[in-house]
Amino acid sequence: MRKIFMDIETDALLDDMTCVHCIAIAINEDKPKAYGPDDLEEGVSEMLHADMLIGHNIIGFDYPALMKFGRTRLIKNFDATFRDTLICSRLLYPDLKEDDWRRMHSPARKEFPKDCYGRHSLKAWGYRLGHHKGKFLEETQDYGTYTEDMADYCKR
């Protein structure tokens, strides 16, 4: 089975978005590869060969974002099963606020930011699991320009 783990970076949220900057794809257990503005179509082509497409909020954001920018080959030729880890998180951990309350009142509390409390975001899960995605989104003010730092962030 060909599983593709994916993420995208854009210049804004869905309604205000004007471009997809990059797609990061990891096939099965391989290291992720980022496809920047000049080779987005190559990344989309890789996705067409997936049996399962896995990502955080791919149903609510990533897939609609790709469709918004004319990646109609995806809709016409896509047979893969979607595994949206945001939906999985909400289904598997409906009482996350209780778990986080205990986390916030434990010796590990200094490691868990208050803005992650009760959230199912990648940032929050990164802190819970000790795999921080990075601070690119927090530290940058310009999402309108593609950078290698953005590509590195997308691959995490």
Each PLM stretch: what is its role?
Residues 1, 49-51:
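A general structural motif
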Residues 1-22:
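Entry/capping segment at the start of metal-dependent catalytic domains
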Residues 14, 30-37, 52-156:
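Active-site-proximal helix-loop-helix substrate-binding element of RNase H-like nuclease domains
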Residues 22-24, 34:
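Ordered hydrophobic segments in well-structured contexts
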Residues 26-28:
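A generic structural motif
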Residues 40-47:
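Short amphipathic alpha-helix with an adjacent loop that forms part of the alpha/beta core around
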